[in-house]
């Protein structure tokens, strides 16, 4: 994976206020507990920026998360990566009690 990153790349996980080097980011992902799978749901590319939305889930089916990732490339490699993670689950009770929204069709 290191070949995809610039030597001075910076990765930020905003939801947990963490900043990593590329090496630390790769290590954090490789050593993350459990067996994980992922599905890329959306990709948008404009100039040197790529935005992805993905679902990441445990191999046994639970838990499940979604991540929005913002990549800035330099010379074809990742120079900056900003990720925003969210837990998948039902809408909160207060919103359900108001009768707002409906489930997104699969």
Predicted regions and their residues:
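C-terminal and inter-domain tail/linker signature
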Residues: 1-106
């Amino acid at each position: 994976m290191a070949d995809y990153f610039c030597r001075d790349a910076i990765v930020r996980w905003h939801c947990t206020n963490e900043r990593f080097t590329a090496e630390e980011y790769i290590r954090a992902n490789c050593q993350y507990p459990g067996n994980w799978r992922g599905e890329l749901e959306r990709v948008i590319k404009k100039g040197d920026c790529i935005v992805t939305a993905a679902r990441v889930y445990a191999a046994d089916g639970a838990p499940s998360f979604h991540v929005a990732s913002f990549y800035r490339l330099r010379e074809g490699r990742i120079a900056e990566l900003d990720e925003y993670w969210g837990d998948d689950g039902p809408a909160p009770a207060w919103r359900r009690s108001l009768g707002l929204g409906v489930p997104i069709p699969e």
